[in-house]
Amino acid sequence: MTISDKIRVYELSRDLKLENKDILDAAQKLSISVKSHSSSMSLEDAKKIKNLIRNGNSGKKIISVSKSSFKAANEQQNNIDNQNKDSNSRSKPLNKEKPSKESLNKKPLLNKPVNKEENSLISSNKKNTAKLKNPNPPSRISNLQSQVLPNSHNKTQHTIKTKNPNEKKNSTKIVQEKKSLNNNSPLRTKSPARPPIQLIEKPKNLTTSNKDIKANKKNDNSLNQRPQQANRLNNNNNFPKKNINNPRIKNTPELVGAPIRREDPKINSNRQNSNSRQPPSNIQASPNRPVIPNRQVTPNRPSNPNRQGVSNRPGGGQNRQGVPNRPGSPYRPGNPNRQGMSNRPGVGGQNRQGAPNRQGSPYRQGDPNRQGGNYRQGDLNRSGSKFNNQNPSGIRKPVAPNELMQLQKTNASDKEKLNRSNFEKQKVEPPKQKAKAPNSRLNASPTAKKTPHRSFTNNSKKPGRSDWDDSAKLEALRNKNPQKQRQKVHIIGENDDSLTSETSGYSGEKVSILSASLARPKKEKSEEPKSQKTTRQFKKKNKETTRQRQKRRAMELRAAKDAKQVRPEMIIVPEDNLTVQELADKLSLESSEIIKSLFFKGITATVTQSLDLATIETVAEEFGVPVLQDDVEEAAKKTVDMIETDDIESLIKRPPVITVMGHVDHGKTSLLDSIRESRVASGEAGGITQHIGAYQVEFEHESKKKKLTFLDTPGHEAFTAMRARGTKVTDVAVLVVAADDGCRPQTLEAISHARAAKVPIVVAINKIDKEGASPDRVKQELSEKDLIAEDWGGDVVMVPVSAIKKQNIDKLLEMILLVSEVEDLQANPERLAKGTVIEAHLDKAKGPVATLLVQNGTLKAGDVLAAGSVLGKIRAMVDEHGNRIKEAGPSCPVEALGFSEVPTAGDEFEVYPDEKTARGIVGERATDARATKLAQQMASRRVSLSSLSTQANDGELKELNLILKADVQGSVEAILGSLEQLPKNEVQVRVLLSAPGEITETDIDLAAASGSVIIGFNTSLASGAKRAADSNNVDIREYEVIYKLLEDIQSAMEGLLEPDLVEESLGQAEVRATFAVGKGAIAGCYIQSGKLQRNCSLRVLRSDKVIFEGNLDSLKRSKDDVKEVNTGFECGVGCDKFSTWNEGDIIEAFKFVTKKRTLNK
């Protein structure tokens, strides 16, 4: 159907009763852009095509059924003719027409003017034609000419109209040749019998081929697309004579099945530029069509005598012999008798490189269907190929089957139409399968064998088979595994010697012409190999063999081992625990070394097990690496960080917060005491600092009183807690180093703390009054840690002091003030308070108590604040003097009461305007804090639990299971902290549940199942809990004082210990006489001290040496058995296992008693 003013190609072909290819070729001649049978064109373009075809046909029919049947009859006769012609052609010499080197190396355009040599060949062909007497010559050459020359004849009728200059130059010669050929051949010869070995009888064949060509005009797209081949046919008309005389021609490899490439736009453009196209009139297949000008044809090609159906293949055909005008192409006699070539315009002809008459090429054998053993099986008698668009004679295209079929792959509708038209024309040959290359030819020689790699063509069946009329079978054959068929054909095409050197030449250009009207197959062809190649590469890239994997692993292990040979100077432990693998990485050791070290210390561990800080320090010291606790590498939330944009207008200077750090033996505490005592003499009380860990002093500097806030960090407890929370409250760090000891591991730790807080460091070199003090040595050691003194050109202030003699204390304070002034410390006292919790504890009378350091704003009594996950409302505040105050400004330490729980040291606190807002924030923080704490507790217990399991296997482990319930979370944490301080060498305390609140029935059930004791601290029992405890025999202990609770728990732990057996002396006796009784003996003794008891243990001493130790089995006094004998009495002593008594032996009587063990032992 037409679309507005347009018409489809297949509609036009149906109207004109032509093939789609004919219409597409005509459109290409007229430069009308159409791509496939479904492309549309304007009605004007359609009229042009109609006029072109009608003018070319000159009123003749395109195809008739009678010609198809006539063609089939000719094909049967040609089989016999081919065999005879082959035998004649073998006896003819082939070397007469060997092209010159110059002409072989020179590869002209396909439409090349006929040279002299070709003219001579044409004239010789004419002579041969004149000799023919029989109108039906059996020769293959005549058959080839009959299928090619009429087309050429028809085209020469229009050479006067052509725009190609080459055609005009050669038109005279071609017209003459046409006349000679037509005069020698009748118009239509239907004679079924032909003389057997008449090789040069062209006239009959010419006439027949003219009719055949007219019948196959629909299929003659290749002729129109490749006018160059017609020129070759024309120029090669004189070749048959020499070919017949050349015996090698028969076996010359003919490039009949050359693999055709997909159409390349560059090749196509070159083809259009280089090929001198025929005018539109050349499209029509006239029965009297002469050889196309400039198309050199080898009419007498003895190497392919039996190839029928060549008339429709202008590029191939009878005249494909030596190809004299193909420069550089030797004789390739391996494909001599390939039939069905003339209908392939892009391959046949004398100018085709790698053509059958390549001189010097050996015979290619091994293809069964090549006559004489030298013919390519897949190319000999391929007939009726729908791609070749030939008449029913069974002519086969000369290109490689896989290439051409993929190029000419059409959709289903095209295939049906082409198959239908071919079937109507031939009646005997079914349409060819789309993806299968023709495997056998109908007219193959009797001795030809079928190549197993070739797929069957439509003529592989006998003509007239009724089963080929079934369209379903045809469709099934067309769609049957085309990829495999293409692969098979492609392999044969690659092995074809006639294609290897010339596949990139004119054959490629001809392919582009053949596929000009079929864009879809080209797409499939180009995409399939690419996708396969990509997939193959992807799989190959991602696949790693076992050998490669082992090699890569070995290289990685070697590199890791090389990297671990350098030991670090120190290691930093994050959050006080590391796994074995992490510790090995930090120490640059193998994990097996760490496990071995732990094993020798009695600890069984795996690479994923966590180690506590003490264990890490022990292992690291063994390898000579000091251990430092990790600093949280995040910005310190100092006062300036707590200042908001609204505070800028109200900022004032605030006192600095100074933290004193250093090794415990370097006088840190003494220096703090010295500063406090000097201020006490001035009337400033500082006793409160013993409780809150922070205090504030005044110092006169430049006639002004300056306040300094000192943060006491004994044992690094408060400071470590703050670092763990990522909070830094220090403005200036004072590093105390002993002049007689130098830098110690804790000194390095203090430096690390200060650097993590990003605060300035002031070094106090203490103990300068002692003998052996060397401040310069301390400066040298500190310079190695990048702390360079000012007098050495650095920026670190170092002050030599003596805490005992109070030397340079004022100078130290002055330097601290100078450094703090450089820091420009400011705060806004008019806003709500923000700060940090320095210390927190649970007081018996006051409840949870926290020491707060206000960093910004003013803290007032009654404020609602949130400290971490703890909510509080300030009920009272106490300053460093112990006085109650109502408010505290920036940098002021206070002791605050009123928290719901004991807050965590190091948490930040912030005052909120109302309690509701504070509660919402506290609830979110509490959830996160509990999850974090649980993870830390589980991590810290891994090693101890592992070692405990080993002890339990040995029967040495005792456990006390507890369930702890308290009034508030602060009490729970305080009790848990105290329990951690108890000795755990032999008895472990396992707290299965710890939570604030009352004791419930659920707690009773858990205790009954686990055998635990319930500890209640300042809490009560829920209803029903007491009854459940009595029924389950669960022990509940309630306490109000933490000390009593800890004493009872310690006593319970000691009760789990095995008691000690202690030897207790009873008395001593001396042996004064012996009496033999039966087999034994009795010793008469005198009790010197103490007493003897029956069944007690005794020890016999002789000359101060123990000769026997056992039990006292018999004790008598005057023949009476008694239980004991006291001092001053005589008695008889008998032992079952000892009878060698001597006078003077000493008997020591004793017994073993149990003694309760304590946890301290």
From Swiss-Prot:
Main localization, broad class: cytoplasm
Cellular localization per UniProt: Cytoplasm
Annotated segments matching region G3: 712-715
Top-level taxon in the UniProt lineage: Bacteria
UniProt-listed Pfam families: EF-G_D2, GTP_EFTU, IF-2, IF2_N
GO CC, any one term: cytosol
Binding site for GTP: 662-669, 712-716, 766-769
InterPro entries hit by this protein: EF-G-like_DII, IF2_II, IF2_N, P-loop_NTPase, Small_GTP-bd, T_Tr_GTP-bd_dom, TF_IF2_bacterial-like, TIF_IF2
Record field: compositional bias (Polar residues): 139-154, 295-311, 352-362, 380-393, 440-461
Keywords tagged on the record: Cytoplasm, GTP-binding, Initiation factor, Nucleotide-binding, Protein biosynthesis
Role, per record: One of the essential components for the initiation of protein synthesis. Protects formylmethionyl-tRNA from spontaneous hydrolysis and promotes its binding to the 30S ribosomal subunits. Also involved in the hydrolysis of GTP during the formation of the 70S ribosomal complex.
Listed name of the protein: Translation initiation factor IF-2
Native source organism of the sequence: Prochlorococcus marinus (strain MIT 9515)
Lineage start: Bacteria, Bacillati, Cyanobacteriota, Cyanophyceae, Synechococcales
